[in-house]
């Protein structure tokens, strides 16, 4: 069926010393502009080849105005912890106020080998109300519900079902 979207992970220089200077300015000045320009480049290519489709581009970095390129940002490689989950609501609200309406997170958290069934379910419950519902994690702990114990899997299934019930809205 082809490609329905693109994932531009690491759309910013991950290791870029503050003292580095480029034609566009210092590293700190252009850090997020790099992701913005990458999203623009992808969107322009997407429109060239798929002119009748709205771009679907997952990007981790951007800048003011990046939403015009069909960019759907997530909060990055967030800690798989209660503190990691707690910060997601504020981040999503702030990004929404800045025009990034498709803001979301790696459901379940991304980084670390810590796993807590209760934390995972709470993150899935939060994700039901996000514009993008996407469990994703580093390889240390699988993010997909199918790899969880039977009780956690059943609870996650309820969240997925609720998500599908809400989709028409």
Where are these regions (language model features)?
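Catalytic-domain carbohydrate-binding cleft regions of carbohydrate-active enzymes
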Residues: 1-169
């Amino acid at each position: 069926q082809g490609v329905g979207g693109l994932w531009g992970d690491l759309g910013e220089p991950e290791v870029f010393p503050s003292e580095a200077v480029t034609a566009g300015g210092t590293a700190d000045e252009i850090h997020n502009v790099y992701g913005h320009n990458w999203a623009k480049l992808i969107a322009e290519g997407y429109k060239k080849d798929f002119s009748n489709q709205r771009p679907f581009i997952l990007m981790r970095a951007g800048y003011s105005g990046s939403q015009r390129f069909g960019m759907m940002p997530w909060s990055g490689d967030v800690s798989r912890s209660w503190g990691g989950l707690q910060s997601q609501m504020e981040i999503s609200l702030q990004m929404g106020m800045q025009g990034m309406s498709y803001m979301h997170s790696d459901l379940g958290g991304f980084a670390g080998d810590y796993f807590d069934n209760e934390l995972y379910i709470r993150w899935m419950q939060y994700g039901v109300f996000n514009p993008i519902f996407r469990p994703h994690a580093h390889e240390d702990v699988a993010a997909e519900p199918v790899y969880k114990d039977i009780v956690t899997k059943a609870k996650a299934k309820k969240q997925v079902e609720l998500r599908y019930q809400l989709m028409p809205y």
